[in-house]
Regions:
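Conserved AdoMet/S-adenosylmethionine-binding subsite of the radical SAM
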Residues: 1-156
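C-terminal accessory extensions appended to soluble enzyme cores
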Residues: 125-196
Length: 196
């Protein structure tokens, strides 16, 4: 938290933290103090918590290295309780056969009273990612003309077709009155404008 504080004091800009981990009580207190300092300077602090599955989490994350989904849900509630406007980062979304959409809908329901919005988008894969997932290219259907090279690395990324899954999540968010965005920047702008 100290590095974040130093960066804020140097640049005097909004602060956006994305995490899959959770903060202990001391860190949460420090976050609250920093949030007040940021707000006093006329800026805003946002915290996005990344969760994209409940029971199937081990498909995309090593459960020994990050907080459990239920603990992250509790963390979102803690952030809301101290006056922050947490964002649920529900991405990447996998095809229903890999991670059921119902799990993602449960995440939205469980955080609906505490998040300001949801950011949810599809899954981009390359050979390395497929290998880590224990899958092969033929396991998925892909969006047409949605390929790109990542940075300077010759690494072709293809986007898995999850339009049905995203539509279901958008419907769930709409039914609960929660805005859903595909990218972080519109979500950040939404929360900042919500406050002004």
């Amino acid at each position: 938290m100290e590095l974040t504080r130093q960066l804020f004091r140097k640049y005097k800009t909004n602060v956006f933290i994305i995490t899959r981990t959770v903060f202990d009580k001391k860190q949460l207190r420090e976050l609250d103090e920093l949030s007040k300092e940021v707000n006093d300077a006329g800026k805003m602090m946002l915290v996005a918590v990344s969760i994209n599955a409940i029971d199937s989490i081990s498909i995309c994350e090593n459960p020994d290295l990050v907080a459990t989904p239920m603990r992250r849900i509790s963390f979102i509630k803690e952030l809301s309780a101290i006056g922050l406007h947490p964002i649920l980062m529900l991405r990447p979304v996998f095809p229903n056969e890999v991670i059921p959409v119902a799990e993602c809908e449960k995440l939205i329901e469980a955080t609906s009273n505490d998040v300001s919005c949801v950011v949810s988008s599809g899954l981009g894969v390359n050979d390395s990612i497929l290998s880590r997932l224990g899958m092969k290219e033929s396991d998925f259907s892909y969006k047409e003309n949605q390929e790109y090279l990542q940075g300077a690395i010759e690494c072709e990324i293809k986007f898995v077709n999850v339009e049905k899954e995203l539509a279901a999540l958008h419907k769930k968010c709409t039914s609960l009155g929660i805005p859903m965005f595909e990218h972080s920047m519109p979500a950040i702008n939404y929360v900042i404008n919500m406050e002004t």
